[in-house]
């Protein structure tokens, strides 16, 4: 085991504070409408230009192990805020820096660190409750567009396209962000449910000009196994042929003799049929088949529940209005599933989303929920260069997270004003002792930090602006973009309550832990000696030079 270096007390905290300030100073330059960009060097390709706090934080590693620990802890604040709300990373970093700087001054002055933390925690709980009471519902397109615009660094085109996407696919619908090929942002919406599996054979195509297979008023057979023997399929194929309707088979796979027979039947016009693989693998495939079944009123044919393919009847088949298959995707239009079943499945998936701790599982569950609850919208980001494209795409993704958070928990006045207004919740708050009171007062000063930083980045005097905002009430605040005071909501400067809340909670949590640090342990960095010169072997053959 490598030898360790241990630092105690003030010397440990001073080192940690250096790391905190290096990272926070780089991140906070991006805050507000007049925040600056940060250029990140990449090991290959062009540098990345960003105004996204968490992207800047992730790039920072310091040479000194103890300073780096401080930087990594603040990086965790940004990540926590990003994981919960998808935005507010810069605000969280600024708050954490203020809490740590104020807290370590109090510790140096002889206050008890544990009581300081308890005071900070008490004040945080009160401010979070006040933020929730200040929040107003965010339901109309105008408010959604304003939230998206603010989060996308005051880019109205991004706010508007997100509002339009939400309007088309609903609050639960899937909205994905992709790199476009043009200069302008584009929005395309897929009605109905889509999954990423295309036709198994090009011989199923019935629209050669567009290379798609379109099935009108079809029947849908869902099978949770591979189909290779055509005999299993014959009873259901005969019943479908008598009905005169087209058929789509969705199975784990359709191969060999079974696929060849389906192709021949389709080409001869005996049964208009197509086949695709079921989306996903193993348990996810079973779950997706169940979602398709609920949406279309079908029953999944699975031997695990006692249903064999030979016993399948028309009653087991789904009845969507139309199906469109291309090489990569299958789209189900207007499934005929019972509304009560769809609502029950939506409620169950929502419960699973709340309970899961895995980001990947949550993403897949939300995808499944969206397939049941709404359509799919794709925002294609347009830009002139690849560097601009990456920067713009990151802003669109941040804005999308912010608007989802706003719809979830409502909006509060933006520009750091909500935190200043929430201070009224701790006006008369008292701790159990004087050190806890110092912790409460410390947080009171720290929550002004985001407003101060926004004003400083805009080139104005922070103290003057903070005093004027404090004298006002309600939504009164400072518009850093135009330099005027007024009603923040009316000026369209909104923040999602969830973003502000999670930024404060993450900053208080990590900030409080850093204040209570008394010792730090790190590996000793050994300077590697320069390699020795190779043995020259007596420099043979050079004896006659003397």
Swiss-Prot record:
Keywords in alphabetical order: ATP-binding, Chaperone, Cytoplasm, Isomerase, Nucleotide-binding
An example molecular function term from Gene Ontology annotations: ATP binding
Cellular component, GO annotation: cytoplasm
GO biological process: protein refolding
Binding site for ATP: 30-33, 51, 87-91, 415, 479-481, 495
Pfam families assigned: Cpn60_TCP1
Catalytic activity: ATP + H2O + a folded polypeptide = ADP + phosphate + an unfolded polypeptide
Domain of life the protein comes from: Bacteria
Subcellular location: Cytoplasm
Primary subcellular site in the record, as a coarse category: cytoplasm
Enzyme class: isomerase
Signal peptide: none
Enzyme Commission numbers on file: 5.6.1.7
Record-linked InterPro entries: Chaperonin_Cpn60_CS (IPR018370), Cpn60/GroEL (IPR001844), Cpn60/GroEL/TCP-1 (IPR002423), GroEL-like_apical_dom_sf (IPR027409), GROEL-like_equatorial_sf (IPR027413), TCP-1-like_intermed_sf (IPR027410)
Cross-referenced PANTHER family: 60 KDA HEAT SHOCK PROTEIN, MITOCHONDRIAL
Family (UniProt): Belongs to the chaperonin (HSP60) family.
Self-association state and partner proteins as the record states: Forms a cylinder of 14 subunits composed of two heptameric rings stacked back-to-back. Interacts with the co-chaperonin GroES.
Function statement: Together with its co-chaperonin GroES, plays an essential role in assisting protein folding. The GroEL-GroES system forms a nano-cage that allows encapsulation of the non-native substrate proteins and provides a physical environment optimized to promote and accelerate protein folding.
HAMAP family, per database record: CH60 (MF_00600)
Name of protein: Chaperonin GroEL
Organism, scientific name: Azotobacter vinelandii
């Amino acid at each position: 085991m490598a030898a360790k270096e241990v630092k105690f007390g003030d010397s440990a905290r001073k080192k940690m504070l250096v790391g905190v300030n290096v990272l926070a100073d780089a991140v906070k330059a991006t805050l507000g409408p007049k925040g600056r960009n940060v250029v990140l060097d990449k090991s290959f390709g062009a540098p990345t230009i960003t105004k996204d706090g968490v992207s800047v934080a992730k790039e920072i590693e310091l040479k000194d192990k103890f300073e780096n620990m401080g930087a990594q802890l603040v990086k965790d604040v940004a990540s926590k805020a990003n994981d919960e709300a998808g935005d507010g990373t810069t605000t969280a970093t600024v708050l954490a820096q203020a809490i740590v700087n104020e807290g370590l001054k109090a510790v140096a002055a002889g206050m008890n660190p544990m009581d300081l933390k308890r005071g900070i925690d008490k004040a945080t709980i009160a401010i979070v409750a006040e933020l929730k009471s200040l929040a107003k519902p965010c339901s109309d397109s105008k408010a959604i567009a304003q939230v998206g615009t603010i989060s996308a660094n005051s880019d109205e085109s991004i706010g508007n396209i997100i509002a339009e996407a939400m309007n088309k696919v609903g609050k639960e619908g899937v909205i994905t962000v992709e790199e476009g090929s043009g200069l302008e942002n584009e929005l395309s919406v897929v009605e109905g449910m889509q999954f990423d599996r295309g036709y198994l054979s090009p011989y199923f195509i019935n629209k050669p000009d567009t290379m798609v297979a379109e099935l009108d008023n079809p029947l849908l057979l869902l099978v949770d196994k591979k189909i290779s023997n055509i005999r299993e399929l014959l009873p259901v194929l005969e019943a479908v042929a008598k009905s005169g309707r087209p058929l789509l088979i969705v199975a784990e796979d359709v191969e060999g003799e079974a696929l060849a027979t389906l192709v021949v039947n389709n080409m001869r016009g005996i049964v208009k049929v197509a086949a695709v693989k079921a989306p996903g693998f193993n348990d996810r495939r079973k779950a997706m088949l169940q979602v398709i079944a609920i949406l279309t009123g079908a029953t999944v044919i699975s031997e695990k529940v006692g249903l064999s393919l030979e016993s399948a009847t028309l009653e087991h088949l789904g009845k969507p209005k139309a199906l469109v298959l291309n090489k990569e995707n299958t789209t189900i239009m207007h499934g005929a599933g019972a509304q009560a079943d769809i609502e029950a499945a939506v409620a169950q998936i929502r419960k699973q989303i709340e309970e899961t701790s895995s980001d990947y599982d949550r993403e897949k569950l939300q995808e499944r929920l969206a397939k049941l609850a709404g359509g799919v919208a794709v925002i294609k980001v347009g830009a002139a260069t690849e560097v601009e494209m990456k920067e713009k795409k990151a802003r669109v993704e941040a804005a999308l997270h912010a608007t989802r958070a706003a719809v979830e928990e409502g909006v509060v006045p933006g520009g750091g004003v909500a935190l200043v207004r929430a201070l009224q919740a701790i006006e008369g708050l008292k701790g159990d002792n004087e050190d806890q009171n110092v912790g409460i007062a410390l947080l009171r000063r720290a929550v002004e930090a985001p407003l101060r930083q926004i004003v400083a980045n805009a080139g104005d005097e922070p103290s003057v602006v903070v005093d004027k905002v404090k004298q006002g009430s309600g939504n009164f605040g400072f518009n850093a973009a135009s330099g005027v005071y007024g009603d923040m909501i009316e000026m369209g400067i909104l923040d999602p309550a969830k973003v502000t809340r999670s930024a404060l909670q993450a900053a208080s949590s990590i900030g409080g832990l850093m204040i209570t640090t008394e010792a730090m342990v790190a590996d000793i960095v050994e300077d590697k000696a320069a390699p020795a010169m190779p043995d020259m072997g007596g420099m043979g053959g050079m004896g006659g030079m003397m």
